[in-house]
Amino acid sequence: MLYNSTQNAAEVVSAAQAIAQGISKDGGLFVPQEFPKYSAETFNELLKLDYKGRAKKVFADFLSDFTEEEINDCVENAYTKEKFGSDNPAPLAYAKLNGKELNILELWHGPTCAFKDMALQILPHFLTKSLKKTYDGKDAVILVATSGDTGKAALEGFKDVDHTKIIVFYPVDGVSPMQKHQMNTQEGNNVTVCAIKGNFDDAQTGVKKIFTTPEISAKLEANNMLFSSANSINWGRLLPQIVYYISAYCDLVNAGKIAMGDKINVVVPTGNFGNILASYYASIMGLPINKFICASNSNNVLSDFIKTGVYDKNRHFYTTISPSMDILVSSNLERLLYKLAGNNADTTKELMTALKTVGKYEVSDEIKAEIKSKFFGGFCDDEQTKATIKALFDTDKYLCDTHTAVAVNVYEQYVEQTGDTTPSVIASTASPYKFSKAVLEAVSDGTDLPENEFDMVEKLFEVSNAPVPAPLAALKDKKARFSDVTEVNSMPQYVLDALNIK
């Protein structure tokens, strides 16, 4: 299995190279040249396996330059009971709302209480093995732009991993207090955290620019280092996300909720487009998905794109109570466009250049039609998000976070507009306790709220009786290690200083 750049047909690399490098030298993203196709027989075999077994099968089909022993080692070390609380790191929960049964895929049982753990607990294992195969002896410098959850999950995954250093940038006012405290208290001798004076898109653009600046790469090379990424632009981040959609389908069949071969819908709260893209890739492999429901907050660039075929980032940026979706440039959409353009790197490059230069592009009528046939885009604002949290809690005592609530709200819009009652899997991406203030405001009368984040956690527990995840409870007495803030245009120098490179 080889990988191409979405912007340069001539760039062909192995899986290990794609993971180690993170992003193509031309700025494109790596995608597999082909996808394995799973028959009904394959899915029936997957039914009998646990989560680890399903993961091993999927990884073996994409990582052809990894041995079976290497893949087993990665999986067994990543998805442990100690890290995820059970043998199934991605369990389904069931709740009812307005007469509909919701199949909620809880992806937040890992060490940082967000869905990013599903990929970022295994990525360090993928990366260290990839480095040995491709750049043996070099240290990888992991650069991360985060809207909240990726940063902490990457820091936790890479802390004290040999031959790696990790630097995380986050928007100074664009993450929740809990997310900020999680990052700034991070342990490890190879970690650095810095806020930027800007939003997530500024952070992500800054990181991409550093990646593709030859002078900076040359300085790292001279110091026996290379850049890699822990954002979902890295194929090693995206691949593990395919697994949990396949596993959720198998779990629904085993639970008697659907029969093998039945179609499902997938509902995903979407920012950078990686999570929903993973479900799309699973469908290419044979997972029977009827519709991909893309849920946005007030930063509704994606829902507009799905409706019109025009992607336009020239719009107001909202800071919302679902900050992991406060994004106007969805990086992984590039991979979908590449696929829908018939794997045409020239077309993809043209669209991405337009986005970079004028902030917008329009896809062809053929691509518009294909997107409309497979995707539904909707959005809701903060008040609708809170109303959904309250409705779900009042109806079934199920407590969800703000991002999951956006997905539930948009799912309800979809059913109302289409009448489609196909069984649906809703991706739940974070613990409600990561966003205690907003969730507490939703389920209580909103008065007499504590000012301290951890007092809010305790108050939310009193109101809801939903268990507080141990990793979040343990943060209360941790002191901050990091407090740096930098301008966006100072990010390159900050990286060099952090690495002690002159």
How should each PLM-predicted stretch be described?
Residues 1-502:
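PLP-dependent amino-acid enzyme catalytic core
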